[in-house]
C-alpha cells in the first residue's frame, strides 16, 4: 500500500474542474496569459558581452544569464538563460 499522494493527478483534476480541458500542468491553457506576460516583460540588457555560458541552440556565448535559489538550500541554484543571438531560453 502506498501512502504517497499523486499530486500531479490531483493538480490536473483541479485544473479541469476549475477551467475545463486544455492541457495538463503548466501547459494548461489557463497559464498561456502568464507565459505571454513573462515573454513580454523579460528583456535582457541591450548589450551582452561574451561569457562562459554557451547557447545550446546556436553555440553563441553572448548569453544573458542569472541564477536563483528555486529549491532547498542543499540543492544547486537554477540558471535562467536567454541567448542574445537566437533568442532561445532555457534553465539548467
Curated annotation (Swiss-Prot):
InterPro entries: Rpa12/Rpb9/Rpc10/TFS, Znf_TFIIS. Keywords: Elongation factor, Metal-binding, Protein biosynthesis, Zinc, Zinc-finger. Signal peptide: none annotated. It holds the Pfam family Zn_ribbon_TFIIS. SMART domains: ZnF_C2C2. The keyword Zinc-finger applies. Zn(2+) binds at residues 55, 58, 83, 86. It comes from Frog virus 3 (isolate Goorha). This is Putative transcription elongation factor S-II-like protein 81R. PANTHER family: DNA-DIRECTED RNA POLYMERASE, DNA-DIRECTED RNA POLYMERASE III SUBUNIT RPC10. SUPFAM superfamilies: Zinc beta-ribbon. GO terms for molecular function: DNA-directed RNA polymerase activity; nucleic acid binding; zinc ion binding. A zinc finger (TFIIS-type) spans 51-91.
Amino acid at each position: 500500500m502506498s501512502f504517497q499522494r499523486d499530486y500531479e493527478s490531483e493538480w490536473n483534476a483541479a485544473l479541469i474542474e476549475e477551467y475545463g480541458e486544455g492541457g495538463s500542468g503548466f501547459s494548461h491553457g489557463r497559464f498561456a496569459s502568464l507565459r505571454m506576460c513573462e515573454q513580454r516583460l523579460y528583456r535582457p540588457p541591450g548589450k551582452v558581452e561574451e561569457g562562459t555560458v554557451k547557447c545550446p541552440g546556436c553555440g553563441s556565448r553572448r548569453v544573458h544569464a542569472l541564477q536563483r535559489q528555486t529549491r532547498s538550500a542543499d540543492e544547486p541554484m537554477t540558471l535562467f538563460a536567454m541567448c542574445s543571438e537566437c533568442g532561445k531560453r532555457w534553465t539548467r
